[in-house]
Amino acid sequence: RVQATFFLLGENMEGRRKMVEELVKDGHLIGNHSYHHVQLNKLSIKEAMGEIEKTNRLIREWTGEAPVYIRPPYGAWSQELEKVVDMIPVFWNVDSLDWKLQNKEQVLSCLSGQVEEGDVILMHDGYQSSVDAAFALVDHLQKQGFVFVNVEEMVLE
């Protein structure tokens, strides 16, 4: 069994409460990915906070816990947001390009030989090819001795 962190888009959560509850029940960590997948650093602070807070409310209401971590869409973050957002921004150092390739074999090829201990791999759940690639990647990396943890466990280490 693998632990992961799912950074959820508020607009994609709508109508999927059971799925979110299942993720939590399965021991995964839930983080915020904004409401509309916009570049937060291009918005006013008030608009950016609205994007974050709207998704935080949904997560808190559905899981009983306020999210601690946020993955800003496109990795777009600013010093101003850092000052006003009381959350820990999480970035990645390995991009699977799954959003662009939309092909399981190409995603696996892209990641082949790239992943090292301590890496944060960026993947998306919006494409079946990404989901299929994630399962195949987990199997492949576990056979190599990799252990999967959620973001919180990485931060605490």
Language model regions located:
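A short, charged, Gly/Pro-tolerant segment at domain boundaries
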Residues: I70, E80, E152-E157
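Alpha-helical scaffold elements lining the catalytic groove of polysaccharide deacetylases
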Residues: V38-E65, A76-E117, S130-A133
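Active-site beta->alpha N-cap acidic-glycine motif
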Residues: R1-K54, L58-E61, E65-A66, V138-H140, ...
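A broad, structure-centric signal for solvent-exposed, well-ordered loop/edge residues
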Residues: G15, V20, I30, W77-Q79, ...
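Catalytic grooves of carbohydrate-active enzymes
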Residues: E116-E152
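A cross-domain feature marking catalytic cores of carbohydrate-active enzymes
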Residues: L8-G10, N32-S34, R71-Y74, N93, ...
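Phosphate-binding glycine-rich loops and adjacent basic patches that engage nucleotide phosphates
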Residues: E11-E22, V68-G75, D95-Q102
